[in-house]
Amino acid sequence: GETEKATDYLRFYSSQRLLGEHVPYAIEAWPEGNQRHLSAESGLYCRIITEGMFGIRPTGLNSFVFTPRLPQEWDHMNLRKICAFNQVFDIEVKRLGDQLQVAVIADGKTISNRKIKEGENIRIKF
């Protein structure tokens, strides 16, 4: 729902927390001396992209539903080499006017290639 607001927070978080001041993982895993700790945040950061921006939700061992949320100032976004649902696949999202062109590609074959309205779900079964 709040793609633009979420993108602003993601941009701020990325610049301050992930790209800003921190120490190597070996130190962060044992944060003595009040060192910043990123180990848990690193894993959760990926979920912002996969579950938030791409809206990926598993529906079975070989299937999922996703709802891409492309920020207004972006013209495209891609996830490459996703290893899930017993497949390795890509998701490509491009803005075409007021619609999104969304492709899912596995092993060089197009599984789905559709134009959708913002907020529309796409179901994929491998």
Stretch-by-stretch model annotation:
Residues 1-126:
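Non-catalytic C-terminal accessory modules of carbohydrate-active enzymes
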